[in-house]
Amino acid sequence: DFYDWGVGVGLGVLRKLTVPGMLSEGSYHDYIPETYRLLNKDYCWLEAYHFTKSVMEYFKASETFATGVVCGSLYDSRLIRTEPIYNNIFYGHDKMKPVCGATVELLQAGAVKYTYTTDQLFNGVYMFKDVEPGKYTLKVSHPEYDAFEQEVDVTANNVTYQNLALDRTRSTAPEVVKYSPVWKEG
């Protein structure tokens, strides 16, 4: 991007650099759900990973990453965020409450290869880095949610995104509290 604001050509924050530089506008910290995701170091690592790939592409590097990445976020399938901090401004699955403290496993041929526990920072983010290419089973467990499994294909030099809606485990038996019509004797 080049702009002429009367003080020289170029973006102001990059104008006086003496080395190559990049400006990150990959996320919006004033969008509250994104703010919570940015608290997760692995989520921030992903932006650096994409920067690295873009530099490699720009300079037509012959090498690529031999491994892949599996990442995403876990959220409740029914519970909607209601905290006043959100001002009812959220989109897509960001409307749903993230799942904190879930254990996410990546299995290959039934053996656990990688394990990740989602943090308590209300973002539901999980990530597996440097995953060898191949077919895996993504397994999610949490005491308050039904177990979840899904097959994923990991390819070299790519990110496999899996945002997952989890169903809360019902802990109380259903109870009839009212019915109609009411039966009357006589």
Feature locations, PLM:
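Active-site-adjacent mobile loop/cap segments within catalytic or ligand-binding domains
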Residues: 1-64
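A short, solvent-exposed beta-strand micro-motif common in secreted/extracellular proteins
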Residues: 124, 134-144
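Hydrophobic beta-strand segments
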Residues: 100-106, 138
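A short, amphipathic beta-strand motif
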Residues: 68-76, 164
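Compositionally biased low-complexity segments at domain edges in trafficked proteins
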Residues: 166-186
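Hydrophobic core positions of the immunoglobulin-like beta-sandwich fold
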Residues: 127-129, 164
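Short, acidic Ser/Thr/Gly-rich low-complexity loop/linker segments typical of extracellular
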Residues: 97, 106-125
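Structured interaction patches on ligand/partner-binding surfaces of diverse proteins
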Residues: 143-171
